[in-house]
Amino acid sequence: MINTSFAGLKLVSPIIVGSNSQTANIQKIVEFEKAGAGAIVLKSLFEESIMREISSLGNDDHPEAYDYLSGYVSEKVVTDYLALIAEAKKRCTIPIIPSIACHSDGKWEEFAKRMQGAGADALELNVMSLSTSRVYKDGDFERIHYKIVENVVKLVNIPVIVKIGSNHSNITSLCDGLYARGAKAVVLFNRLFPTDIDVDRLTFTIGQALTSPADLSLPLRWAGIVSASVPQIDIAVSGGVDSWKGIAKSILSGAKAVEVASAIIREGASWITNANKLLEEWQQSKGFNAPENYLGNMNAAEPENEDKLLRTQFLKYFSEIH
């Protein structure tokens, strides 16, 4: 069997369908459950998009009208999202996890309680931000994460999951701090908007939107390190899982689950069914009855593994193969 648990939720599979455009579609959500998904993360409610819609209204001439319309815009977006949560819970039995993509603490935190009321099984906070200021006090970036989690945990009693970026100086310390403030799990890692440049038109374009297997290396490394250092917080790997092997690698590194979007977008819901089948066959061939039997077997808790995971230079590697 491939049953597991993550953030206190029971999953029939370690495959969590990650937030993407398809998880805003109730028919697709039902299809993913039938294919064998362990849980669904709904398409993120973007703090940024709500604020942008409000800003586009303008408020120079009629401030009272602006206040009314801005309230309507944000309420409409949130109400539609709450309806999606309720419908998904009505149609599915697996955990439904709404996602808020945010970069600051503020009014949006009130949405969290309403999502819980709509039936959410857990809440994913996708903290997306870049720290680029020259005037920067050490730890400010991390403190934003802590404040967001503290505020949300006060409002809900469902598990809070935090999806973080890889752009932190000490990811282990951040995960430890998030757990201390009430987070039940972390997802390693979110992905910033991919930017590219068209050298003919001299314009910005969208870079590679979907992940590839090469993207798996970084979250694997940190899953192996964090699961050994902060074993009390659950981990999910996100980015680069394109086959059952990526799932097995993630669990061996210490992740209890994986969030997958790109592979499912490319291949459809059948990818979930096939990956589940092949993962279970591999488990049986290795003598494992369930993911918990090999969870973290290759994390940094073993000195031999720690040496490999903490290696940052290529020199020793090349000297071994030449």
Q: Language-model segments: which ranges?
A:
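Short, basic, glycine/proline-bearing loop/turn elements
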Residues: 10-16, 70-71, 159-160
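Glycine-rich phosphate/pyrophosphate-binding beta-alpha loops
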Residues: 19-23
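Alpha/beta enzyme core
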Residues: 25-60, 79-86, 90-97, 101-237, ...
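C-terminal extensions of enzymes
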Residues: 266-286, 292-322
